[in-house]
Amino acid sequence: MAGSAPSAEDGTNGDPAGYPAGVLAAAVLATTGVSFVLVGSAALWLRGESIPVGDADVVIEPGEQNMQRTRAALADLALQPHAVPQAARLAMLDIVTIMTSYGKIDCLLRRGRLDWERLRKNADVMPVAGTGVMVAASADAWRLRSRFKDVRR
């Protein structure tokens, strides 16, 4: 359960804050001012699902200013900053994956262009490690997860 003491059984991988790395990656991204909704396993974990968290899947709000913030934040967080596309390119891509010291962040950019209003409307801000993270509703997170997993098979 979110916020409980870490243990080997609860999926926190012994993290001292009690959060999986993917959840912490989303929290760090949230502190940068990037507007996004957390989806995928990290969102489901925060919603109380017993699910392993592999990474942070974030749907980025479309718009030039947010793309500029996203590019700057990802470049600051990335293990290889030169690999982060410029903001104008980000606005055209479907998915960008960035490796950080907190783990992998998948930026679902196309999903933001298609579903931002609905995802944002159904999402809630949840406290994570001292900051607020916009977290998708469980139904939305499950729907995106099943759609994305089906496409990747």
Question: Which ranges hold each PLM region?
Answer:
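Compositionally biased terminal segments of proteins
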Residues: 1-153
